[in-house]
């Protein structure tokens, strides 16, 4: 499962995500959020407060192209 660490948050996706639109699971401690990449929106969040979620969305937007490249590279195999 490809994982990209950005400012302490693990952005990852799973092989079973292949049939879904591009997204990442963002993990930190025991918290997790699922973020769609096109457009960048929250699908769900467990454990993050609104400030943390806002930061995660900002990081996702800032790294959107990079995350999409990893997604496309992984699932084009």
Q: Across the structure, where does each feature detected by a protein language model lie?
A:
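C-terminal structural segments of small proteins and small subunits
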Residues: 49-77
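A short, structured beta-strand/loop element
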Residues: 14-50
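Short, charged/polar N-terminal "headpieces" of proteins
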Residues: 1-20
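Generic detector of short, locally flexible boundary/turn motifs and exposed helical patches
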Residues: 1-3, 32-34, 67, 76-77
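A general marker of short, structured functional hotspots
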Residues: 5, 9-10, 40, 44, ...
